[in-house]
Amino acid sequence: MSSTAQKNSLSPTGNGVTKRKSGSAACVHCHRRKVRCDARIVGLPCSNCRSSGKTDCRIHEKKKRLAVRSILNPVPIRCRPPSTSEHVPEASPPSTISEPTAFTTAFRGVQPEAAAPPASVAPNVQSKAQHLHSNSYSQTSPQAQECHLPPASDRFAEQDAHADFEKRLVKLIDDEEGSGPREIQRGVRAIYVGHELSNMSFLIRQQRDKDDDVYHFAGSEIPRRQLKTGHDQLLVDALTLPEPALVDELVQAYFTHVNPGYPIVEEDQFMSQYRNRDPSDPPPILLLQAILLVGCHVTHPKEERDALKAIFFRRAKWLFDNRIERNRDTLVQAALLLTWHSDSPDDDVSANAHYWVGVAARIATGLGMHRNPVSSRFAPRDRRMWRRLWYILVQLDVMVSLSYGRPQAINLEDSDVSPLTASDFEGCGARVQTDYVIHFSELCTMISYIVRERFGLRVSSERRKAALQEADEALANWSLRLPDHLRLRASDMDPWSAMLHLTYNNFLILLHRPHPRASAYSDDYGPHDAEICSAAAGVITSIFEELRLNDRLKYLWYSGVHTLFTAMIQVRVELRFSNPVLAINALRRFDSASCSLRELAKYWSHATTILRLFEDSKRLQKDLRLATSERSRPFSSTQDQPQAQALDQNKNQHQHSSADAPVQPPQPDRLLPSYDSPTPDSTSLPQTAVSPHQNLTFDSWIPSTNLATVDPMDQPREFLDWRQLFSFTDPDQPVLPMSMDGLPELEDEWRQIYWQETPMSDLLQDGGWMHG
């Protein structure tokens, strides 16, 4: 053993002399856990890896840090000298050369001569742009690759780090001391798991029963990255555009598939500037680079799309950070567009949609977009644009807040912006989805108030109960007021209606699912929570399946991944039902959701981490096998054997009846009856004393000018008919995409599966949710 340790501690040098390495080196596992390692003494594997049964023990090697050069002394870029044997291209006409130069100069302070690259650099930039958008990436010369590609060792290290980031969901509690919080040391990222509404907090607290008051956990080491582009080339790179044909394609794709539902840019004005090619009035280069990024997201295949988006994002971010664009309205627009970029999965705090929504909110409130511009001196076109941008910002802020369980960047109590009207969309093109934007703004505004009243840190328990009752009533009323073309339908689902109902049903699950051990909300559940959550999860998986079959998943925004994550957690619980019919039905929905998540991973990097979470779950694989066969043992404990036998008998009868005759849909007169608040016993619910500000229902926060009139609702009854929360165009169409027979009898079982420690612990058995 000592000889082995001696061999491992010695390393040959270039002159044949062995040199003893430092004894402080540790293996990769001990280095990640920040514990002492004795690999240099006892050899490999070390004592810690032997005790934990790890077989891949190896010495951790530090990454070599590249020498950081001064800005005044950049790394010289070697370019291939022109060869006499190669064909020399003919000189382009003067109009062809001057047009892109003037077009890319989006600000008056830089003259076309200053914006144009030097003579020695121009051929390289032009060839890079042409090569980038060709289908073949192998035509680049070795010299050009040497100019733009990092060393092979750095590329391999970056690939390994990227693979570790993708598996970070299964590494948080891999250590023996993973049952408790690990010290957050210097150089290690702190992970905020969000409040009780987030899926991260849900899974973590279901696994860690002693960490109710812990919201920050230790993550991975902070990565070190080097600047790959020379400082003297950043301006030239940021002002560079691809070939005109590709620019036309991406701009058209953006205004066809994205801007109609998120009218951030006034299409008529922008396209007029874009087509005229007027050097004195060009479109903002920052806005154009951001539009190219979003257009690339919805058009090109993955390999080419990732490369193009990285380049467009680098250019747009450099222009944004260096304040090349002086119009703050354009900065808000660009920040909202940059939320479509899927940055590296190692950071969703200072990158990705959460970061850019916060940046847009800061600039917008600094400009005063949250106040109603009543001054007559305000240009009508700018007033319309401000109102659109403000409500789109509210939408994205609410969706990203639900995704991560983080506070909203916008407090609507500080805003008095008037509701959106059809006139606010003037100049946004013929394809603009006016009704969708208006109703989606109403939904997100309502969700914002519900979250604050229901999940606020300083909200009393009485107010929480009242907020849940008001939330269900307001959501049902909003659903009933939807126009026919926005209502939920079984087929031909367009991306706008899909995003509307995905956000709606995602919030239904977050509002009604039991919290782990139900700490602060133990008495806030209702008699139909199981049906509401199961129906909402079924709607979500059906919408994703419809979009996947029609190749429309690419049109969904960032939050679509987390919406599917919420539904898969609900379906994951249903896989453990003792009723085999419900379990097998859940298995089909889980398979469909997994396929949709795998497809979303092609567009959003954080979908890959969630996919790995479910694919690497050991207990999940066991439940998937059990779901394919009849379960002879019900969920009840051994002391409830009479009830278990009765449940088995009822289960067999239900199975035979379902095999003989199809399941009948609910009768039309049962679709939309009146309802009461979803509480365990509405007759005994105490009357809560609320402040004058709190006695308003959530309907009062929806702009009344945009709501269609509906018949008054009946008087409250004892229980809520939860089917009013799900609206369809066809009144004869079944409300649910699946049979709900047998689920009401399993309400307690459903709640216990959510509360118990085992069902979700396998998702974190090899690790946990890690963002940061």
From Swiss-Prot:
Keywords: DNA-binding, Metal-binding, Nucleus, Transcription, Transcription regulation, Zinc. The gene is amdR. This is Acetamidase regulatory protein. InterPro entries: Amide_Lactam_Regulators, Transcription_factor_dom_fun, Zn2-C6_fun-type_DNA-bd_sf, Zn2Cys6_DnaBD. It is found in: Nucleus. Transmembrane segments: none annotated. Residues 114-123, 671-686 have a biased composition (Low complexity). Gene3D superfamilies: Zn(2)-C6 fungal-type DNA-binding domain (4.10.240.10). CDD domains: fungal_TF_MHR, GAL4. GO terms for molecular function: DNA binding; DNA-binding transcription factor activity, RNA polymerase II-specific; zinc ion binding. Residues 1-23, 78-99, 114-148, 627-690 are annotated as: Disordered. The lineage of its organism: Eukaryota, Fungi, Dikarya, Ascomycota, Pezizomycotina. SUPFAM superfamilies: Zn2/Cys6 DNA-binding domain.
